[in-house]
Amino acid sequence: MGIHDLSKVIADKAPDAIKETEIKNLFDRKVAIDASMSIYQFLIAIRSEGSNLVNEAGEATSHLSGLFYRTIRMVNHGIKPLYVFDGKPPTMKSGELLKRGARRKEAQANLEEATEQGDTEQMEKFSRRLVHVTREHNEQCRQLLTLMGIPFIIAPTEAEAQCAELVKGGKVFATATEDMDALTFGTTVLLRHMTFSEARKMPIQEFRLQKGGLEMSMEEFIDMCILLGCDYCDSIKGIGRQKAYQLIKEHKNIETVLKHLDPKKYVIPEDWHFAEARELFLRPDVTPAAECEFKWTTPDIDGLVKFMCQENGFAEDRIRKSAEKLVKARKGGQQGRLDSFFTAIPSGSAKRNTVGLLPKPGPPPFLF
């Protein structure tokens, strides 16, 4: 789920923190990509003729196709992608996972009803809701990335948190995901729509809260996100995005908010673990950036052909030509960014770490 309506809050209250950009503007950037989110997008992608990509055994292969071609597209534009896979979900996410399971059961029942009625539009709708990324999908994608020479890491828990750690530690320029909670975990640059197909014509959205925005401390921002609704605890019914923003701007933290809420109007969730959720965002279980080492290597063309064509039924001529493009792009992507030759000069001093003002001391914003 990420953070409910956070993108709308930022668009409304801090529009300067969002800009639209093109993939060509990310030349020579290292980007940490939320692998599970990308794989999910590839799995639900339906071909124009309405059928999923499958191999001879009838197993879906759209995730392999999407990962292969979108990654090559990024490399062709000089981007150095690093995929980050989810590890074990945090214990606090168990409630959200149970809700997702219940929604899938409901979708299955609705799909069966739509199938009986021959309603193709509803069938497609509920089929998408049944899609989830499996261990096998992840293993296949990691095998493909290895053959492509593209690095990946497996996070201890949440991929978004690990991506944010890599950004904060100066290992990569940005986090690429559709989940806005990457900002709540502290990434300074968030890219949305990064792995969307060109056919969707969706510009990449770049979020940089430190470049103009909400004027909240990180702790205040996290508490606002919890009020908006996150994966780790319930939210207060009746508090929408405007109210959540207003309450935190006025009271600074959830503890003080609760002292001023009308109990007749707002019902606080029973056993509401907002403090634990806050701690999870502030200090997530991640591998320290300094301990993360990865490199981009030469693609194994013959290995790619064997895996993609012989094992998964893709056309050899297309795979081989694309793999050769990948090799060429890797060799040609050596020129650095112009701004990598300059050092950002900090302006003034900050009294506290604020979202929308200055980040904590760390690496300069232009590293790659």
From Swiss-Prot:
Residues reported in the UniProt entry to bind Mg(2+) 1: D34, D86, E158, E160
Gene: FEN1
Disordered: region residues: 103-123
Family per record: Belongs to the XPG/RAD2 endonuclease family. FEN1 subfamily.
Compartments in which it is found: Nucleus, Nucleolus; Nucleus, Nucleoplasm; Mitochondrion
Entry binding sites for Mg(2+) 2: D179, D181, D231
First-tier enzyme category under EC: hydrolase
Entry EC no(s): 3.1.-.-
Protein residues bound to DNA: R47, R70, E158, G229, D231
Region described as N-domain: spans on this chain: 1-104
General function of this protein: Structure-specific nuclease with 5'-flap endonuclease and 5'-3' exonuclease activities involved in DNA replication and repair. During DNA replication, cleaves the 5'-overhanging flap structure that is generated by displacement synthesis when DNA polymerase encounters the 5'-end of a downstream Okazaki fragment. It enters the flap from the 5'-end and then tracks to cleave the flap base, leaving a nick for ligation. Also involved in the long patch base excision repair (LP-BER) pathway, by cleaving within the apurinic/apyrimidinic (AP) site-terminated flap.
Listed cofactors: Mg(2+)
InterPro entries the UniProt entry points to: 5-3_exonuclease_C_sf, Flap_endonuc, HhH2, PIN-like_dom_sf, XPG-I_dom, XPG/Rad2, XPG_CS, XPG_DNA_repair_N
UniProt remark on cofactor binding: Binds 2 magnesium ions per subunit. They probably participate in the reaction catalyzed by the enzyme. May bind an additional third magnesium ion after substrate binding.
Listed Pfam families: XPG_I, XPG_N
Gene Ontology cellular-component annotations: mitochondrion; nucleolus; nucleoplasm; nucleus
Region (I-domain): 122-251
GO biological process: base-excision repair; DNA replication, removal of RNA primer
UniProt keywords, alphabetically: DNA damage, DNA repair, DNA replication, Endonuclease, Exonuclease, Hydrolase, Magnesium, Metal-binding, Mitochondrion, Nuclease, Nucleus, Phosphoprotein
Record text on subunit structure and interactions: Interacts with PCNA. Three molecules of FEN1 bind to one PCNA trimer with each molecule binding to one PCNA monomer. PCNA stimulates the nuclease activity without altering cleavage specificity.
UniProt name for this protein: Flap endonuclease 1
Chain positions covered by the region annotation Interaction with PCNA: 334-342
GO MF assignments: 5'-3' exonuclease activity; 5'-flap endonuclease activity; DNA binding; magnesium ion binding; manganese ion binding; RNA-DNA hybrid ribonuclease activity
